């Protein structure tokens, strides 16, 4: 009997998910290489954890479930090519990603044009709202984030601040939006500098904002370039004033702990309530460490919601899945809290958190 059971397992016949070719598939385009690779790998882990949970719970449509992950390389052309492969070769009904708004937006436009469902899990530009009828958004966008961060900065006692942000769709939205909200509160922006990404040094920009003698520096930056900015700010003596990061975990994802220590900031909420805690515990158990960024929970929710929508649709037809996802999105208990979409497929009341970097990690304050 033991021998025959061994044969069954060897042949892959002892499980209901014997043939990978029969898997129900969805896609993900993540930044696994390039300046945001740390975030991309963190999110990939969450995607795999979600895939494993779906399969442990019986799969989708009675079949195994698989998320095909492609690398954007942090480049919009590469991301669109990856999405094209997922659509034309793999025939997936849903693609999640990317990370940077400057990449997610053109990729989302392509997916909507092809009639494939796109789920935004990390990009915060308000332009995400305009992607079209098959695009869904799980995360808080800049307008809501700017209100939260400006009020938080005001409550911390900052009155005259300098802003440093990347010169792209995301950075422009943060800089201009924060200015508008902060000035409504009575605050003053003494300098606004938008930097070019990918430079080997940012000393010129840092010296420029330092000359205006702000109460605090408000900034946002992607992982590897942020590490350069934070190191050079320390070397130039700019850490004598508070540094406040919009999206703290992103801005510090590649910065050494001794340099990041003491920074303040805000973030999209990463996990909420008992469901969120169970997810965080499962993540730590599988990967022997906690999440490095706050975006993993959104990817996890997106994968589980997609699996639920495909089951509800009874089909992998993109139009059917889109309709089912709207229904799932009327009230889903996710790890990032309750997910409910408005008529424009945007999340209602997304979570935010007030944070600081202390003892080698991002913690609540």
Q: PLM features: residue spans?
A:
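Extracytosolic ligand-binding ectodomains
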Residues: 5, 20-365
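Sec/Tat signal peptide C-region and signal peptidase I cleavage site
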Residues: 13-20
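Sec-dependent N-terminal signal peptides
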Residues: 1-8
């Amino acid at each position: 009997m033991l021998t025959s059971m061994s044969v069954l397992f060897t042949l892959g016949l002892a499980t209901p998910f014997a043939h990978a070719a029969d898997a129900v598939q969805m896609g993900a385009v993540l930044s696994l290489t390039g300046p945001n690779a740390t975030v991309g790998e963190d999110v990939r882990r969450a995607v795999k954890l979600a895939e494993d949970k779906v399969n442990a719970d019986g799969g989708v449509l009675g079949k195994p479930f698989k998320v095909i992950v492609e690398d954007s390389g942090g480049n919009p052309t590469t991301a669109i090519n990856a999405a094209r492969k997922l659509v034309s070769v793999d025939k997936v009904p849903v693609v999640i990603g990317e990370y940077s708004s400057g990449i997610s937006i053109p990729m989302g436009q392509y997916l909507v044009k092809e009639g494939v469902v796109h789920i935004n899990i990390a990009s915060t530009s308000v332009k995400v709202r305009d992607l079209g009828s098959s695009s869904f958004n799980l995360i808080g966008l800049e307008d809501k984030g700017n209100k939260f961060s400006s009020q938080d900065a005001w409550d911390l006692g900052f009155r005259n601040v300098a802003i440093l942000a990347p010169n792209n769709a995301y950075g422009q939205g943060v800089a201009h939006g924060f200015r508008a909200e902060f000035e409504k509160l009575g605050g003053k922006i003494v300098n606004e500098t938008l930097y070019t990404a990918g430079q080997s040094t940012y000393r010129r920009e840092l010296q420029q904002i330092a000359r205006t003698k702000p109460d605090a520096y408000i900034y946002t930056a992607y992982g590897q370039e942020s590490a350069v900015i934070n190191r050079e700010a320390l070397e130039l003596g700019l850490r004598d004033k508070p540094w406040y990061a919009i999206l703290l975990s992103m801005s510090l994802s590649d910065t050494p702990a001794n340099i990041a220590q003491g920074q303040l900031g805000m973030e999209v909420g990463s996990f909420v309530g008992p469901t969120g805690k169970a997810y965080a515990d499962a993540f730590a158990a599988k990967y022997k460490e906690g999440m490095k960024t706050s975006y993993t929970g959104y990817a996890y929710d997106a994968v589980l919601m997609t699996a639920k929508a495909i089951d509800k649709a009874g089909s992998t037809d993109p139009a059917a899945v889109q309709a089912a996802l709207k229904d799932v999105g009327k009230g889903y208990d996710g790890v990032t809290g309750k997910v409910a979409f408005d008529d424009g497929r945007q999340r209602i009341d997304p979570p935010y958190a007030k944070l600081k970097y202390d003892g080698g990690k991002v913690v609540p304050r």
